[in-house]
Amino acid sequence: MKAEIIAVGTELLTGQVLNTNAQFLSEKMAEIGVDVFFQTAVGDNESRLLNLLDIASQRSDLILLCGGLGPTEDDLTKQTVASFLGKSLVFEPSASQKLDHFFASRPHYSRTPNNERQAQIIEGSTPIPNITGLAVGGILEVDGVTYVLLPGPPSELKPMVNQYLLPALSGNHTALYSRVLRFFGIGESQLVTILSEMIHKQSDPTIAPYAKIGEVTLRLSTKAETPEQAKAKLDGLEQKILQTPSFEGGLLADYHYGYGETNSLSAEVVNMLKERSMTITAAESLTAGLFQSTIADFPGSSKLFRGGFVTYHIEEKAKMLQLQLSDLELHGVVSAFTAKKMAEQSRHLTASDIGVGLTGVAGPDALEGHNVGTVFIGIATLKGAKSYKVSIGGRSRSDIRYIACLHAFDLVRKTLLNGLNLL
């Protein structure tokens, strides 16, 4: 089934209102296996809507119209669709009763003739009750095309879709199932190149790559009649992807850290620390507390994070972390030595299981002979301490700081998986 969404309202075209209904409807159609091929916004203009209906009816099996069902003069959707189909508007009894009750309970409201239009549907339509508003919706099939009329306010449209439209449409369709794989340490272009043959030959399931700041996700999607069938297909594709060799000689599984649209490296680390009843701390320079504040964003973080240090100036590093100023001056603020010592001392001073040190050059200028984007990350555990150098070039100052934290979380994650042994 080919579906099309038509959002009606001049305010959408002028940018006064964001077209969130189209996104919502597309997501819901995908859930029941209906393919949305087109999305269009049209103003409150009868001739342009008639022209669009003529086009849509020739290319789509399901046309979802939202907006223009209200009482004002520019609410023309219902009348225009009725005119296009050569049908009349009739009053829907339940909607009329709701309108009667609404005005009876509000005697100070004026019931003008245009209010009555909200209780009308196109003749032959199956009504879609409006739980939170007055404008009734409707479903009508004419010449093999199904027309759905919905009000514009999301607070009215969403309950109507969830409670009435989806059950009406879902009976004859397979559902769409998706799984999101998350990767860190590999760029989108490299990942897509490695999987190019698989992506080129895809049919069902499909692979869709998305680039995020510092990481990449792959959305695997399939249509199936049951969740079990979908899981079997997605499991097979996932294993094929993760077992694909990378350019570095390992497998793509080496870069895969988790699942889900809203998951993150920090969430993975926090969950792993909670599962192991371990604590973490950090001493930060270039990231200025971003690593620690990210941990503190999670509920219950006080059980795994006792406190930490933000040490920008070299003298503060020496004083707060109880380090020799002469050693810091000898090796430099931006150095493997300093990152390692920051991790060691933060762990020691807070009696934490893991200590992290972050120092580097966020820009815009180079520092101590290091280019912008040079970052040193220290990791300290009961089994020792080590520093790692990372280069994050061609990024803004804020992106460098954010990606540096991602690298730190990834190193902590791998260290936890390795039983606190350093990598």
UniProtKB/Swiss-Prot annotation:
Secretion signal, residue range per the UniProt entry: none
Pfam families according to UniProt: CinA, CinA_KH, MoCF_biosynth
InterPro entries linked to this entry: CinA (IPR050101), CinA-like_C (IPR036653), CinA_C (IPR008136), CinA_KH (IPR041424), Competence-induced_CinA (IPR008135), MoaB/Mog-like_dom_sf (IPR036425), MoaB/Mog_dom (IPR001453)
UniProt cross-references to SUPFAM superfamilies, sorted A to Z: CinA-like, Molybdenum cofactor biosynthesis proteins
Top-level taxon of origin: Bacteria
HAMAP family: CinA_B
Family in the record: Belongs to the CinA family.
NCBIfam families assigned to the protein according to its UniProt record, in alphabetical order: cinA_nterm (TIGR00200), PncC_domain (TIGR00199), PRK00549.1 (NF001813)
This protein's name: Putative competence-damage inducible protein
Organism: Streptococcus uberis (strain ATCC BAA-854 / 0140J)
